[in-house]
């Protein structure tokens, strides 16, 4: 165990020392003291681990006598009592020997999960540090740097809290003894997990070195992605090892170990809430820089950080489930156990619902929708998350009340548990405040968009009023309508450009000679609709145009009356003071003063620090000189519009850039669809050819089968005639053999007759001879 702690401490010190350099470049000297403190604490922990290794070995040798083997299952008797009392209890009751078997590995299992939390926090610190370096190089915004510094301090506090839990588990593990076989098995599994962590740490070091070099090309991005996937696989293998280590032990425990497991449960809950707060801060930070649509690399980096925190949520949820399984076997009353289990299930459901909502909010935040419907949806999701956290807080408060009334825990454990639960409540309150801040920022963004729209409306109204004041009073209403139509021509052109359908596979298709062809005739043409509507309306104006003309005429009359009154008063003043030399000198001095401003543009004039004094001087000059047109009053009206012109141009540029990006995305998707469609078309043609071949083969097979039927019938008839012919041939052969046999008999009779005749002839000759 000491070797494992030493290796882990050294790897963490290497990572922290590396991050020390990154944080120095990012945050300056603000966070040096905090990182030095963390590094010093870890060096102290490594030294203490080296000293405790000998103590672990001596205590292990002293407690080997309490080992009992039953069916290849090793049971260890571990307790906080002295060694003599433990030995007596192991001799008296064998049931108590198997009651605490899993407690040898459970704290170490929790220790391994806290180590996973360390690695996750280290990843988050490194990514936040590299993010800080890129942000400092790209922008010198003090507010963004302060927010990033605040987030890093919060993560450092979480890291210190996890370090305290690590020290507590180290102390608990040093007071326990292990059996030889079980210790060897655990040591081998822990060594394998350590190797996985070392490999992941080396990967992180390599990633950090690549980030410091400032390489941002595609090859570096692919290499980074590959290394991140490798690190993720290493962590998954370590998690599997932890699961195997957890299942290798039994499932019974005593009251003291139950209290320790409950402390581990509270620690994991605090880690979960701290990670939730970190995610909220990252989302707030992401929301403040959302308007920078050109910073794709920053968006990808933010997305990777959110994914890392979500993986940390999943790891904590797995630990939560493990501790819940342990809580199933607690030696307490059935009613109390069932009640506690139901409360834990409720809290887990609340956390899972909050995690799902955070994932959905993450996806919505990665997309770039800015309309009011999207803002309302985000607000509703934030309110739902807030309700989930409030429900979880209520469950924790009820759990705290039940723990305060329990009789099995001592005063020290109760006090420590209350302190931990109060810390959880503070974390929940911080998360709620973060949600409220995010909601307020969303409302501010919505108000800003509304103010932008109002500014556009005021600008359009001011332009219309200026045009109306400069024209003749006998202007035709149709001319006003034409002016309004011209002023909105750019917007209509933009709408026509957006409503124009893209050619490709996604459009409507008509059959043509060459196959499928996009049907663009069904697109919406605003010009044709407007022309048709104007033809239907004829020469008369519509209701909205009439109301607009009435509004313009009323405004013209009021303006004319006001100008007439001002001119009348100025004429009277001029008539009363025209003969005064002081008035002439004032007019001349004002004219000379105003002529000095000829080199300034309207925008420079509005941004001038003495703009109000210049407007006052110009107004006085127009009054004294009896000017026919009040240019200064019109210029004062344009003040707000000109000041907002720069912001409007920036917003227009952002909108154009966003439209360009969306167009590129749509074109890319269209190209993807075209390629997929071409592949589908090729596959369809190949399938058709195969179908034709199959049909031809089927026809040929049917023809061959028909021919086979004919051959079979012919063969049957031939075999029938052949059998008859065989019978006839056999009968003919029998008749032939009978005829041959009969001929042979006749021939034998003939030969006998011939011989008899010859003998008779010989006898007759001899008889005649004897007569002589």
Curated annotation (Swiss-Prot):
Name of this protein: TSA1-like protein
Cellular compartment(s): Endoplasmic reticulum lumen
GO cellular component: endoplasmic reticulum lumen; ER body; peroxisome; plasmodesma; secretory vesicle
Biased composition, class Polar residues, residue ranges: 466-487
Induction: Induced by NAI1.
Protein keywords: Coiled coil, Endoplasmic reticulum, Repeat, Signal
GO biological process, one term: ER body organization
Gene name per UniProt: NAI2
Main subcellular localisation: endoplasmic reticulum
Region (Disordered): 49-72, 465-487, 555-585
Reported consequences of knocking out the gene: Loss of ER bodies accumulation in all parts of the seedling and alteration of PYK10 localization.
Miscellaneous field: 'Nai' means 'nothing' in Japanese. Homologous proteins are found only in Brassicales plants.
Tissue-level expression: Expressed in roots. Detected in shoot apex.
Domain notes: Contains a N-terminal NAI2 domain (472-772).
Region annotated 10 X approximate EFE repeat, chain positions: 98-472
Function noted in UniProt: Responsible for the ER body formation. Regulates the number and shape of the ER bodies and the accumulation of PYK10 in ER bodies, but is not involved in the expression of PYK10.
First and last residue of the signal peptide: 1-24
Biased composition (Low complexity): 561-585
């Amino acid at each position: 165990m000491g070797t494992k702690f030493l290796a882990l401490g050294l790897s963490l010190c290497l990572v922290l020392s590396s991050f020390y350099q990154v944080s120095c470049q990012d945050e300056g000297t603000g966070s040096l003291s905090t990182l030095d403190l963390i590094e010093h604490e870890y060096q102290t922990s490594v030294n203490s681990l080296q000293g405790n290794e000998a103590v672990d070995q001596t205590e292990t040798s002293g407690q080997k006598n309490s080992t009992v083997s039953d069916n290849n299952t090793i049971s260890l008797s571990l307790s906080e009592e002295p060694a003599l009392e433990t030995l007596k209890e192991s001799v008296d009751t064998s049931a108590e020997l198997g009651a605490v078997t899993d407690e040898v590995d459970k704290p170490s299992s929790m220790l391994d999960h806290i180590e996973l939390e360390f690695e996750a926090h280290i990843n988050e610190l490194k990514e936040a540090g590299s993010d800080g370096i890129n942000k400092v190089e790209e922008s010198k915004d003090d507010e963004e740097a302060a927010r990033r510094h605040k987030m890093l301090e919060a993560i450092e506090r979480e890291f210190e809290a996890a370090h305290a839990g690590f020290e507590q588990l180290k102390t608990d593990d040093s007071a326990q003894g292990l059996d030889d076989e079980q210790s060897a098995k655990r040591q081998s599994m822990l060594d394998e997990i350590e190797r996985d962590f070392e490999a992941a740490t080396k990967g992180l070091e390599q990633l950090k070195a690549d980030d410091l070099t400032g390489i941002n090309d595609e090859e570096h991005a692919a290499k980074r992605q590959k290394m991140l996937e490798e690190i993720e696989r290493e962590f998954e293998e370590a998690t599997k090892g932890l699961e195997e280590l957890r299942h290798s032990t039994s499932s019974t425990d005593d009251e003291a170990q139950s209290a320790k497991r409950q402390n581990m449960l509270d620690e994991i809950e605090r880690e979960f809430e701290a990670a939730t707060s970190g995610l909220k801060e990252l989302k707030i930070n992401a929301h403040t820089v959302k308007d920078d649509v050109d910073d794709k690399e920053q968006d990808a980096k933010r997305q990777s950080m959110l994914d890392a925190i979500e993986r940390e949520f999943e790891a904590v949820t797995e630990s939560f489930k493990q501790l819940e399984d342990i809580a199933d076997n607690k030696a307490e009353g059935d009613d109390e156990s069932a009640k506690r289990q139901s409360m834990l299930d409720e809290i887990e459901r609340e956390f899972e619902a909050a995690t799902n909502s955070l994932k959905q909010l993450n996806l919505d935040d990665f997309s770039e929708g800015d309309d009011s419907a999207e803002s309302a949806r985000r607000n509703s999701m934030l309110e739902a998350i807030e309700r989930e956290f409030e429900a979880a807080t209520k469950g924790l408060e009820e759990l705290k009340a039940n723990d305060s009334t329990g009789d099995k825990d001592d005063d020290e454990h109760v006090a420590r548990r209350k302190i931990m639960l109060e810390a959880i409540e503070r974390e929940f309150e911080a998360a709620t405040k973060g949600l409220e801040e995010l909601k307020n920022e969303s409302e501010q963004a919505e108000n800003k968009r509304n103010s932008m729209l109002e500014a556009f409306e005021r600008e359009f109204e001011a332009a219309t009023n200026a045009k109306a004041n400069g024209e003749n009073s006998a202007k035709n209403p149709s001319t006003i309508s034409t002016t309004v139509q011209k002023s909105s021509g750019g917007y209509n052109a933009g709408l026509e450009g957006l409503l124009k359908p893209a050619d490709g596979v996604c459009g409507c298709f008509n059959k043509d000679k060459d196959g499928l062809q996009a049907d663009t005739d069904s697109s919406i043409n605003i010009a044709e609709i407007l022309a048709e509507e104007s033809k239907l309306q004829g020469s008369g104006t519509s209701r909205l145009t009439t109301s607009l003309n009435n509004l313009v005429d009323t405004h013209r009359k009021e303006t004319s009356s006001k100008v007439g009154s001002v001119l009348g008063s100025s004429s009277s003043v001029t008539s009363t003071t025209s003969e005064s030399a002081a008035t002439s000198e004032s007019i001349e001095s004002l004219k000379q003063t105003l002529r000095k401003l000829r080199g300034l543009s309207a925008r420079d004039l509005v941004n001038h620090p003495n703009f109000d004094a210049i407007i006052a001087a110009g107004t006085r000059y127009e009054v004294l000189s009896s000017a026919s047109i009040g240019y200064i009053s019109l210029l004062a009206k344009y003040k707000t519009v000109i000041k907002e012109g720069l912001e409007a141009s920036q917003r227009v540029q952002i909108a154009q850039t966003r439209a360009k990006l969306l167009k590129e995305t749509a074109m890319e998707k269209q190209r993807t669809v075209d390629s997929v469609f071409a592949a589908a078309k090729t596959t369809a043609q190949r399938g058709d050819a195969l179908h034709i071949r199959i049909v031809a083969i089927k026809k040929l097979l049917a023809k061959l089968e028909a021919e086979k039927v004919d051959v079979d019938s012919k063969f049957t008839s031939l075999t029938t005639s052949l059998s008859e012919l065989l019978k006839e041939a056999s009968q003919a052969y029998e008749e032939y053999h009978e005829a041959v046999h009969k001929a042979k008999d006749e021939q034998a009779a003939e030969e006998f007759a011939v011989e008899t005749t010859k003998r008779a002839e010989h006898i007759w000759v001899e008889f005649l001879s004897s007569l002589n």
